[in-house]
Amino acid sequence: MTNDNLYRYLFEGVSVRGELVQLGNTYQQIIASKEYPAPVQKLLGELLVATSLLTATLKFEGSITVQLQGDGPVRLAVINGDHEQKMRGVARWEGEVPTDGTIHDVIGKGHLVITITPTKGDRYQGVVGLEGDTLAESLEGYFANSEQLKTRIILRTGEFEGNAKAAGMLLQILPDGQGQEGDFEHLEQLTETVKDEELFGLDAQDVLYRLYHQEEVKLFDPQSVEFHCGCSRERSASAICSIERIEVEKIIADEGKVSLHCDYCGTSYDFDSIDVAALHENAAKNDRDQVH
């Protein structure tokens, strides 16, 4: 199992749907951007898996952002993904982060914020308190409150064969499945038996067979998941041009350059006085060309 993929599946004769996501490279790139403490890496991995699972529920082109905000050691942890399963994320923390604490120990008094932004249409934002002791329990509460659909979410992170891995599953009763709670609970019990090493090391087909070999499962083609930051030197140059030139020149006079750092991938873009002069010269030329 080497690729980062999201899988969707259905159960024949039962109005329950499932998702399985298995991530390696995507997770590794996100946690490599900073020297995150182990508990923060774990939290980002769970958020990453959760965002991938939630993004798969979008029925339109757009993006979804899942973030945790609080007054604890980790003030912010956020993952952004889109309908193409392109992911990026970052976290901010202060001091020592508890290794074996609950989500309340890590985030403190806080909220789970889910923002859905369609390419066309209005943005939607849902804010819920942190329920239970884990991120998964808070997400299950979100679905119970916002969609009134019984949902079970499993989020796992860890190391497998020397590499950081993140994986998870979502099980949800379909809108027309009300009254089939018994079937859902049966499948829920089966899903909860999944082991970390199975999620991290087996192909999706093998994971599903081990869990549901007595059920009829329809597995759909996978969708690849990847890290995608979106930053570039060109975007950084545009940002510099939007700042008063005298302020930029003062920074260069003090530090020899102006630097823009991308929190998502860790890349720094440096501009010296010659670069800045060229940027403004090109901007002025473009303005003249538009006038004529």
From Swiss-Prot:
Cysteine-cysteine disulfides: 229-231, 262-265
Gene Ontology BP annotations: protein refolding
Localisation per UniProt entry: Cytoplasm
Domain of life, source organism: Bacteria
Cellular component, GO, one term: cytoplasm
Chief location bin: cytoplasm
Modification comment: Under oxidizing conditions two disulfide bonds are formed involving the reactive cysteines. Under reducing conditions zinc is bound to the reactive cysteines and the protein is inactive.
Keyword Transmembrane helix: no
Molecular function via GO: protein folding chaperone; unfolded protein binding
UniProt keyword terms in alphabetical order: Chaperone, Cytoplasm, Disulfide bond, Redox-active center, Zinc
InterPro entries: Heat_shock_Hsp33 (IPR000397), Heat_shock_Hsp33_C (IPR016154), Heat_shock_Hsp33_N (IPR016153), Hsp33_helix_hairpin_bin_dom_sf (IPR023212)
Pfam families noted in UniProt: HSP33
Role played: Redox regulated molecular chaperone. Protects both thermally unfolding and oxidatively damaged proteins from irreversible aggregation. Plays an important role in the bacterial defense system toward oxidative stress.
NCBIfam families: PRK00114.1
Family: Belongs to the HSP33 family.
Name of the protein: 33 kDa chaperonin
Gene (UniProt): hslO
